[in-house]
From Swiss-Prot:
This protein's encoding gene: nd4L
Entry membrane topology: Multi-pass membrane protein
Root EC class: translocase
Lineage of source species: Eukaryota, Fungi, Dikarya, Ascomycota, Pezizomycotina
Compartment(s) where it occurs, according to its Swiss-Prot or TrEMBL record: Mitochondrion membrane
The protein's name in its UniProt record: NADH-ubiquinone oxidoreductase chain 4L
Main subcellular location: mitochondrion
């Protein structure tokens, strides 16, 4: 349980510190999502519940789709702008 909280905090820290790089922001979001999935998985093992394990598989599937859509949007953004860094004004 402490490991998943630690991973979630690393994801938040990575998201906050890397506000100009979209790829690192996407990786940080994935780390946070996988930390939550790991916490759900640990809880389902502790309570001997198969529903939590099924839910974890569902979350991992959605995370894969989210990554594919995010990278597709990133490629379109790169083609439009020529750079993937975010400009704050």
């Amino acid at each position: 349980m402490n490991f998943s909280i630690f991973l979630f905090l690393i994801g938040i820290l990575g998201f906050v510190l890397n506000r100009k790089n979209i790829i690192l922001m996407l990786i940080s979001i994935e780390i946070m999502l996988l930390a939550i999935t790991f916490l759900i998985l640990i809880s389902s093992f502790n309570f001997d519940d198969i529903l939590g394990q099924t839910f974890a598989i569902y979350i991992i599937t959605i995370a894969g789709a989210e990554s594919a859509i995010g990278l597709g949007i990133l490629v379109a953004y790169y083609r439009l702008r020529g750079s993937i860094s975010i400009q704050y004004k």
